[in-house]
């Protein structure tokens, strides 16, 4: 019995060993070493090609000779991938597999959005930078333009510490002397010009195309002098599935560096050493040690949440999203929150001959700001000059106020007792129709309506320390404003290829636009019983400020009509030509110059398509571009820019000679002179560039040179009131030039089966210069501006606008140290410009140039690291 069992056990063990041996033999037989060489269609070996067993992490990379070796089972599939070539899959059925890879034209065939249409990258003749959604900056941003920071050569974005502050944006240098919209690029969202960026959440953006030279921007005519930024939003999918996505970001903002200010003990030591008596300015028996920067500044916590849904099929697509952002400023009392909603629906009808779409965008923004601008009323100003020896609050809980100095406003008092809030409501509706008439011929109609409502609410409490307000026992101001924008655009596109070599594109269109702006009213009331109701019930105030009625909101209607066209021609994808023209008419300008014409022309030569380049191994892509165009600037000008206007100038009292009763009446006075010859600012730009690609397009780039000149600058010039009813005239005088060079490099230094490193570097140099400021009619030597709004320097401008210098030229006194009394002294110059000593009372002749606000060089370096399903971006 025992023997039998042992035998059975032995037999079972032998069986197991046999099966294991059999499986091992089978595996050893099935495992196969595959070798081969990977080449392009010309037979050149490709180094760095990824070879991966499908569905596994088993892989290798080809060597410098294009050779590879990999252990893989028969019947499995190998995947060959390489930048600039299409992916190739090969089934393993032998031990030697050579692969020929085909070039991928996807990069060159990438669709680029241009004005009133799109084209492939290889057909572009002008300077256009495209940034896809995956390449945009991520984080908590209040302005979608900030997503481009460091991504586009020549695009400069200056942010503020206030979350409600508008970022200052310029492209290829300053081209206007006006402020605000007149200095910034023009925005086009989903083909609709002039849309507010506040209506678009960053997560809804699919791509952004930046038109940088005039040959690209001239199609937008009088609004494109500072470049055009075209935003394309995400639409629905056609896969028949409904997709729901969520994304969220959390950020903390901090002041990078605070000023090194004296603390209480250091200030006392300095005062004792220099015989300065500080006793009138603090309680000598109970001195404080207040760090006012720590009291005013904070870490600003921000968070952003976005949820979206999209789906559809081949006939109908839809999408919707909801975004919420809440951002704290680094200055206490400053914050911003916004909720944005967006919906989109598109469908095909009439047997797919008619595309219809409708979208609705809406946003509600709440802003709270502190006083950070007015000299003597600035929280930041007071933060620096307020005495560290005094406390934040008195013993009774009230805000400390040092009445022994001229500017006694406690910065924390201004944060909490002087409140400035704004509510913005925006709504936009867009309807589009595209009729496919015949193959290649489309008719388009775009209709847009945008409504903007603003409510400004200010309240200075009964504890406010501000001058002319603290005695009013609470003051409330409230004003409203509404802007309405209506647009209609219709245009026809025709694209056709003749004889496989001649590619022709034609576009012609018409647009109409009307802006009804500044429809509003405002009121100021004061002397409240308490601070509870603030501006919510101003009827409870004991006094109404008649002079405080908001008179700035004057309804204006501005209209513009335009005709435009474009022609594109390509011969054998080798020689490229584009020409555009636009004619705009605007009621903003003088009756003698309401129409302007803006043409452009550009050429390109794809050198790598020439026969003599077919056998070269250096360039994968080489294209030469040259172009010139003229665009204008009508942004920031209202319906009354060229009109004679009058406004309230005061009051006069009329006494009835019969009854003796008196009445007060408003007096009117001229506030602007009429200029029937006022016309567009015109910017002409010459651009030449080279696009290149090496190493199977693992290294690509662009180098460009431009010369941009803006003439007929619009500015206010002094005139004689003996001839005109008002002392200044808005006129076309002066010229600004911008010359620069830009370089962009895109590279993939590392690409393995699991890890990829993509890097992009852009560098730009721009030289800005004011060529002239005067003509035979209007003349000015220079203009001083740039008031620092710092206590003690209320009338001291630090910048000067003058010929031969850039816009933003600093023109200041040269600090030379301290005198024996501890006061600042400055270099003293004679009338010939010779340094003759120092002075504690410098005059205007002692000012000297000290750099410029215009950056000499801007650059951005972006890196993206991907490991399997993880990604890291660094900027």
Locate each region found by the language model.
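Acidic, glycine-rich flexible loop segments
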Residues: 276-286, 303-304, 373-412
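Short, small/polar-rich motifs associated with maturation and membrane association
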Residues: 1-343, 348-349, 354-357, 363, ...
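Feature marks flexible
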Residues: 398-399, 537, 631-634, 808, ...
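Conserved C-terminal beta-signal and adjacent last beta-strands/turns
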Residues: 30, 308, 756-758, 852-875
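Conserved small-residue
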Residues: 245-286, 521-523, 527, 640, ...
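Extracellular/periplasmic, surface-exposed regions of secreted and cell-surface proteins
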Residues: 136, 184-186, 300-303, 338-339, ...
């Amino acid at each position: 019995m025992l023997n039998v069992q042992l035998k059975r056990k032995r037999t079972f063990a032998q069986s197991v060993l046999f099966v294991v041996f059999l499986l091992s033999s089978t595996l050893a037989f099935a495992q196969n070493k595959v070798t081969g060489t990977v080449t392009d269609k010309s037979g050149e070996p490709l180094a760095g090609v990824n070879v991966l067993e499908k569905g596994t992490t088993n892989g290798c990379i080809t060597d410098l000779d294009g050779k590879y070796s990999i252990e893989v089972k028969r019947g499995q599939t190998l995947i060959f991938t390489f930048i600039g070539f299409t992916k190739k899959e090969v089934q393993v059925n032998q031990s030697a597999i050579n692969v020929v890879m085909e070039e991928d034209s996807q990069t060159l065939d990438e669709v680029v959005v241009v004005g009133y249409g799109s084209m492939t990258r290889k057909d572009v003749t002008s300077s256009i930078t495209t940034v896809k959604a995956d390449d945009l900056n991520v984080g908590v941003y209040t302005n979608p333009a900030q997503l481009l920071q460091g991504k586009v050569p020549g695009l400069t974005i200056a942010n503020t510490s206030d979350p409600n502050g508008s970022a200052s944006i310029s492209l290829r240098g300053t081209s206007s002397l006006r402020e605000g919209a007149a200095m910034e690029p023009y925005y086009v969202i989903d083909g609709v010009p002039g849309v507010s960026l506040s209506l678009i959440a960053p997560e809804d953006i699919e791509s952004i195309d930046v038109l940088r030279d005039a040959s690209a921007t001239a199609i937008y005519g009088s609004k494109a002098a500072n470049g055009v930024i075209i935003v394309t939003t995400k639409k629905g999918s056609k896969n028949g599935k409904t997709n729901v996505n969520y994304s969220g970001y959390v950020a903390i903002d901090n002041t990078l560096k605070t000023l090194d200010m004296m603390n209480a003990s250091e200030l006392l030591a300095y005062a004792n050493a220099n015989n300065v008596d500080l006793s009138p300015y603090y309680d000598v028996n109970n001195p404080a040690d207040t760090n006012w920067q720590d009291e005013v500044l904070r870490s600003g916590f921000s968070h952003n949440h976005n949820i979206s849904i999209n789906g559809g099929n081949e006939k109908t697509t839809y999408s919707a999203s909801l975004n919420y952002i809440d951002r704290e400023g680094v200055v206490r009392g400053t914050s911003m929150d916004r909720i944005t909603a967006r919906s989109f629906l598109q469908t095909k009808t009439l047997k797919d001959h008619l595309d219809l779409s409708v979208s609705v965008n809406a946003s509600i923004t709440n802003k709270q700001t502190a006083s950070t601008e007015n000299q003597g009323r600035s929280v930041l100003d007071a933060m620096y000059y307020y005495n560290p020896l005094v406390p934040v609050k008195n013993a009774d809980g009230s805000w400390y106020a040092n009445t022994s100095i001229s500017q006694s406003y406690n910065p924390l008092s201004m944060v909490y007792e002087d409140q400035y809030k704004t509510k913005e409501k925006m709504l936009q509706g867009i309807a589009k129709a595209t009729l496919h008439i015949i193959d290649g011929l489309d008719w388009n109609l775009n209709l847009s309506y945008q409504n903007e409502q603003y409510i400004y609410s200010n309240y200075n409490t009964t504890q406010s320390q501000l001058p002319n307000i603290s005695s009013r026992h609470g003051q409330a101001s409230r004003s409203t404003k509404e802007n309405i924008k209506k647009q209609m655009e219709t245009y026809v596109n025709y694209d056709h290829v003749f004889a496989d070599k001649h590619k022709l594109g034609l576009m012609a269109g018409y647009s109409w636009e009307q802006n009804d702006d500044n429809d509003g009213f405002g009121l100021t009331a004061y002397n409240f019983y308490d601070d509870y109701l603030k501006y919510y019930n101003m009827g409870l105030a004991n006094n109404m400020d008649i002079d405080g009625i908001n008179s700035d909101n004057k309804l204006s209607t501005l209209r513009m009509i335009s005709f435009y066209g474009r022609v594109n021609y390509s011969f054998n994808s080798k020689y490229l030509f584009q020409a555009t023209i636009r004619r705009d008419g605007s009621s903003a300008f003088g009756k003698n110059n309401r129409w302007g014409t803006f043409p452009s022309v550009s050429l390109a030569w794809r050198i790598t398509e020439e026969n003599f380049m077919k056998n070269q191994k250096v360039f994968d892509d080489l294209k030469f571009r040259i172009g010139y165009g003229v665009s204008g600037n009508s942004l920031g000008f209202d319906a009354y820019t060229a009109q004679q206007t009058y406004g309230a100038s005061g009051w006069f009292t009329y006494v009835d000679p019969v009854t003796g009763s008196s009445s007060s009446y408003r007096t009117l006075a001229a506030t602007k002179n009429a200029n029937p010859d006022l016309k567009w600012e015109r910017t002409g730009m010459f651009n030449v560039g080279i696009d290149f690609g090496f190493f199977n397009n693992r290294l690509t780039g662009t180098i460009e040179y431009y010369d941009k000149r803006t003439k007929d600058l619009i500015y206010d010039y002094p005139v004689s009131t003996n001839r005109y009813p008002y002392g200044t005239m808005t006129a076309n005088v002066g010229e600004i030039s911008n010359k620069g060079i830009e370089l962009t490099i895109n590279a993939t230094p590392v690409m393995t089966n699991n890890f990829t490193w993509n890097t992009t570097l852009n560098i730009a140099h721009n030289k800005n210069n004011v060529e002239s400021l005067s003509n035979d009619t209007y003349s000015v030597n220079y203009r001083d501006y740039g008031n620092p709004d710092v206590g003690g320097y209320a009338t001291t401008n630090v910048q000067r606008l003058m010929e031969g210098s850039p816009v933003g030229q600093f023109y200041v006194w040269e600090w030379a140290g301290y005198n024996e009394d501890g006061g600042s002294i400055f270099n003293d110059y004679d009338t010939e410009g010779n340094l003759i000593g120092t002075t504690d009372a410098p005059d205007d002749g002692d000012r000297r140039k000290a750099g410029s606000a215009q950056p000499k060089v801007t650059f951005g370096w972006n890196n993206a690291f991907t490991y399997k399903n993880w990604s890291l971006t660094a900027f």
